[in-house]
C-alpha cells in the first residue's frame, strides 16, 4: 500500500509574521533571552500558546506550536546573519555585500565597473527585520555607500604629467545609521568633504581618495563600538534592576522582622506589667493577712495550759534516784 504524500502547509503570511513579532514585543520579558531571567517555564509556555492562538485566528491553515517557534527562530537567524554581514563589512573598512534576498543591488549600485571598481550593494533591513533586530537587542550599523562614480581623467592637449588635469565632482559622504532597541533612536555621522577646485592634478585626486576612506572607516568603527557599549550598558542596567529588586525584597524581610520584634517587645512589656500587678496584689494580701496572723498567734498563746510548777528539791531525782543517794 502506497504511503500518502505529506501535504505541505502554506508559508507564513505577512500578517502572521507581524502578529508573531507584535506578540513577542509585548511579551519580551517572558520570551526574549536577555529579558526573561528567572521566568518559570510554565509562564513561557503559556505565552507561546497565547501567540499560537492569535496566529491561528488569522491563519488560513491551522498552525502548531513547533511551527510558530521554528518561524521565529528562522526570523532571528536571518536578522542576525544580516547584522553579522554588516559588522564584518564595517570592521573590514568596506561596505557590506548583498545578500540572497537583497539581490544584486539597485541601479546606483549595479555591477558595472568604473574607475573606482565595482560598487557593492548595502545590506538593508526591512521594517519588520528592523523590529526583530530591536527586539533582539542587536546593534545594527547600516552603511550606505556613495553611488556616484568618479569621472574619468580628462587630459589636456599635451600628454605630459605636469599638464594633466582632471575634473572632479563632489562624492557624497557615507552615512552611518545606528538603531537602538527601544524607541528606535538613530545616530547619524555625516561630514561633507572639503570642496575641491574644478581643476586639480591627478596626484591630488589620489590623495583625497585615500584620506576620505580612513575617516569613514574610523567613524563606522566608532559607531560600532558605541553601539556595543550601549548594549553592554543595557545589560548592566538589567542587572542593576535585578539587584534593586533583591534589595527591595530584603528590605521587606527586614521590615517584617522588625515588626515581629516590635510585637514581641509589646508582649514582653505586657508580661512585665502583669507581673508587676501580681506582685502588688501579693504585697496587699500580705499586709492584710499580717495582723490576722498576729491575732491568731495571740489567741493560740492565750489558750495554751500553764507549765507545771517546779518540784521540791528533796523530791527531785536524776535517772530515777533520789538526790540524797547521788550525794
UniProtKB/Swiss-Prot annotation:
Give its localization: Nucleus
Q: Where is this region: Disordered?
A: 88-118, 303-327
Key word Cell wall biogenesis/degradation present: no
Instruction: List the biased-composition ranges (Polar residues).
Output: 316-327
InterPro entries to which the protein is assigned, alphabetical: Myb_DNA-bind_5 (IPR028002)
Q: Where is this region: Required for nuclear localization and apoptosis-inducing activity?
A: 1-70
Comp. bias regions, Low complexity: 88-98
Principal place of residence: nucleus
Q: Which GO terms describe its biological process?
A: negative regulation of cell growth; regulation of mitochondrial membrane permeability involved in apoptotic process
Please give an example of a GO cellular component term from this record.
nucleus
Which keywords belong to this entry?
Answer: Apoptosis, Nucleus
Name any one Pfam family assigned in the record.
Myb_DNA-bind_5
In what ranges is there compositional bias, type Gly residues?
104-117
Q: What does this protein do?
A: Induces apoptosis.
Record family assignment: Belongs to the NAIF1 family.
Q: How does it assemble?
A: Interacts with HARBI1.
Would you tell me the protein name for this molecule?
Answer: Nuclear apoptosis-inducing factor 1
Protein's organism: Bos taurus
